[in-house]
Amino acid sequence: MEIAEIYERADIRSLPIDPLSAARSLGIKAVSYKIISECYQITFEELYRKSLWGFSFLEGEFPVIALNESACCERRRRFTAAHELGHCVLGHLHGGNLESAEREANRFAADFLAPLCVLERCGVSSAAEIGRLCGISESAAEIRLRELRSGIFRRDERISEQFARFIARYF
């Protein structure tokens, strides 16, 4: 599933993007480590060994995102939620190359939370502005700024149209 389709299905029209709301609109359940621990009788230590931040899995045939609600800061939790959403929509929960899946999920999260075609049309000029606008970490914002300045990215008209009112108000 393409990011533009997720934005459309979740009616996402502005930044910052709420990845958990998008997941819910796609029928993907998001639960805390506390709930996972209680439902599956798994200790927090076992969950932390799996991942300090979060992970995704299939419950039957339904994708679930498990998030450590006490991990780090809000921006890191948002990126983790978007990363796990990526695993769900990119089909990674059915197996495959783990290293490749992690790279793809990281790329998905960056593209999903900070769409370059929207940032370009908003005329952003600094990593700090991207971080504030998209609710991402300073390091993630710096990477997005470098990618934006390179000019080598897909300018998706569907996404630009979806965010048109937001872009117009941003100026």
What spans do the regions from the language model cover?
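Active-site hotspot residues in diverse enzymes, especially metal/ion-binding acidic/histidine motifs
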Residues: 1-171
